[in-house]
C-alpha cells in the first residue's frame, strides 16, 4: 500500500488493514493490551495538601516515593472543578467529530504555532503515530495566538483558558512539594523554569483496524518539567521502568490526572526523580481521548541539578539551556531512527545475498525441478 497521509485519520478507521506508514517494527509494537490494567501506579489524594499539618507531610511523602520509583502517579481530590473537566472533554470530542474540512481550517503543518495536526511524528522518522491532535500554546499568556485556537465547538476557547489556568496552578503546587522534598525553598523548581511555558495537547486516537501493529504515540520521555494527563475510561497509556522489557497499562480513574515528570524535572533533581518512559497504544473497539498539559521551562532557562546530595556527582557534564537540551534530545532520537533504518536495510541485503548464494550453489536440475 502506498504511503498516504490522510486528510484526517477518522477516514482510515473504517479500513480493514493498516497503511504501511503506520506499521512499526516488531520490537516497537505493543506487548500488553490497552485494557489489561495494572494498579502499580499509585493514586494519591491531594485533600489536605494546603494544610501545614501532618496531612501535607504524608501526601508529600507519597508523591516523592512515586517520583523516585516510577516518575508517574495519579492525583484525585486535586481541586480542579469537575465541571471544567467535563466541558473540556465534551468540547474536544465534538471537535474531533467535525468534518475533515472544519478541522483542517486549523491545520498546523508547516510550523504554525498551534492548531490541528494528523499523525504527528518527528521529522525524519518514517513511521507515523495513530492519532489526531489539537495543540494550544497557552503560557506565557502574552504569546497566545487565539487565531490558532479552534472556534468550534462554540465556547471551547473560554473553557480551554480556564482549564489551562487551573492546570498551571496544580502543576506549580506539585512542583512546590518536590522542591521541599529536595530541601529547597518552595518555589525553587518553578523559579528554575524562569517564565513557565505551557502547552495543552488534546489527543484523539480513533479506533484502529490493526492495533497490534502500531502505536498511538511512540515510546518517549517528555522533555519538560511536569506533565498532567486527563484520560477517558478506555485505557491505552502505558509505562515502563525497566527500559521497555516490561510494560504496564495505567488504570484509568474517573476525574484523576496522571502526573509524570519530564527530562527537565529529572535533571533538576540530579536523577533522583524519574522521567517517566511511556507510550500510548490503540485498539479496534473504540476511540480514545486524552488531554496532556505540559509545563516546560522557558527556552533560555538553565538546566542543571538544583541540589547534589552528599556523595553524589552531577548527572550532567555542564549547565545548558533548555532549548539546547531539547535540540540534543531531538538529534539523538533522529540518529537512533536513522541507525535502526540502516540496520534493517543491511539485514535485508544480507538475507538477499544468502538466498542468492544458496541458489547459486544448487545444481541447475534442482532449481528447475
From Swiss-Prot:
Q: Name one GO molecular function term.
A: metal ion binding
Top enzyme class, one word, equals oxidoreductase
Where does the chain bind 2-oxoglutarate? 288
Tell me the InterPro entries matching this sequence.
DIOX_N, IPNS-like_FE2OG_OXY, IPNS-like_sf, Oxoglu/Fe-dep_dioxygenase_dom, Plant_2OG-oxidoreductases
Tell me the pathway. Answer: Secondary metabolite biosynthesis; flavonoid biosynthesis
Pfam families the UniProt entry points to: 2OG-FeII_Oxy (PF03171), DIOX_N (PF14226)
Q: Which residues bind Fe cation?
A: 220, 222, 278
GO BP term, example: response to molecule of fungal origin
Task: List keywords of the entry alphabetically.
Answer: Dioxygenase, Flavonoid biosynthesis, Iron, Metal-binding, Oxidoreductase, Vitamin C
Entry cofactor note text? Binds 1 Fe(2+) ion per subunit.
* Catalytic activity field: a (2S)-flavan-4-one + 2-oxoglutarate + O2 = a (2R,3R)-dihydroflavonol + succinate + CO2
Q: Which cofactor does it need?
A: Fe(2+); L-ascorbate
Which parts of the sequence belong to the Fe2OG dioxygenase domain?
Answer: 193-297
Q: Which Gene3D superfamilies match?
A: B-lactam Antibiotic, Isopenicillin N Synthase, Chain
EC number(s) recorded for this UniProt protein: 1.14.11.9
- Tell me its family: Belongs to the iron/ascorbate-dependent oxidoreductase family.
**What role is this protein assigned?**
Catalyzes the 3-beta-hydroxylation of 2S-flavanones to 2R,3R-dihydroflavonols which are intermediates in the biosynthesis of flavonols, anthocyanidins, catechins and proanthocyanidins in plants.
Q: What is this protein called?
A: Naringenin,2-oxoglutarate 3-dioxygenase
Q: Which gene encodes it?
A: AN3
Amino acid at each position: 500500500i502506498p504511503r498516504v497521509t490522510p486528510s484526517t485519520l477518522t477516514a482510515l478507521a473504517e479500513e480493514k488493514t493498516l497503511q504501511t506508514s503506520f506499521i512499526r517494527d516488531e520490537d516497537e509494537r505493543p506487548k500488553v493490551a490497552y485494557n489489561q490494567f495494572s494498579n502499580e501506579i499509585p493514586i494519591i489524594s491531594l485533600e489536605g495538601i494546603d494544610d501545614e499539618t501532618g496531612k501535607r507531610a504524608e501526601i508529600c511523602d507519597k508523591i516523592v516515593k512515586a517520583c523516585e520509583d516510577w516518575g508517574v502517579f495519579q492525583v484525585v481530590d486535586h481541586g480542579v472543578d469537575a465541571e471544567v473537566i467535563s466541558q473540556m472533554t465534551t468540547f474536544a470530542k465534538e471537535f474531533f467529530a467535525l468534518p475533515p474540512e472544519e478541522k483542517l481550517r486549523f491545520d498546523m503543518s508547516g510550523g504554525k504555532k498551534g492548531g490541528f495536526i494528523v499523525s504527528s511524528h518527528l521529522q525524519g522518522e518514517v513511521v507515523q503515530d495513530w492519532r489526531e491532535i489539537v495543540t494550544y500554546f497557552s503560557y506565557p499568556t502574552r504569546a497566545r495566538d487565539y487565531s490558532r485556537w479552534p472556534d468550534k465547538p462554540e465556547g471551547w476557547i473560554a473553557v480551554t483558558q480556564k482549564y489551562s489556568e487551573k492546570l498551571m496552578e496544580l502543576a506549580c503546587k506539585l512542583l512546590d512539594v518536590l522542591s521541599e522534598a529536595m530541601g529547597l525553598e518552595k518555589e525553587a523548581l518553578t523559579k528554575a523554569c524562569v517564565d513557565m511555558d505551557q502547552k495543552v495537547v488534546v489527543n484523539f486516537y480513533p479506533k484502529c483496524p490493526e492495533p497490534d501493529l502500531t502505536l498511538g504515540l511512540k515510546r518517549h520521555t517528555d522533555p519538560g518539567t511536569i506533565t498532567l494527563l486527563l484520560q477517558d475510561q478506555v485505557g491505552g497509556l502505558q509505562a515502563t521502568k525497566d527500559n521497555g522489557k516490561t510494560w504496564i497499562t495505567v488504570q484509568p480513574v474517573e476525574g484523576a490526572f496522571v502526573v509524570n515528570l519530564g527530562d527537565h524535572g529529572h535533571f533538576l533533581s540530579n536523577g533522583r526523580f524519574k522521567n517517566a518512559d511511556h507510550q500510548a497504544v490503540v485498539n479496534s473497539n473504540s476511540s480514545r481521548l486524552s488531554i496532556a498539559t505540559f509545563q516546560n521551562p522557558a527556552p533560555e532557562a538553565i538546566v542543571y541539578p538544583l541540589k547534589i546530595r552528599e556523595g553524589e556527582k552531577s548527572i550532567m557534564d555542564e549547565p545548558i539551556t533548555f532549548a539546547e537540551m531539547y535540540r540534543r534530545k531531538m538529534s539523538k532520537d533522529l540518529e537512533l531512527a536513522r541507525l535502526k533504518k540502516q540496520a534493517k536495510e543491511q539485514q535485508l541485503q544480507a538475507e538477499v545475498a544468502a538466498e542468492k548464494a544458496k541458489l547459486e550453489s544448487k545444481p541447475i536440475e534442482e532449481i528447475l525441478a
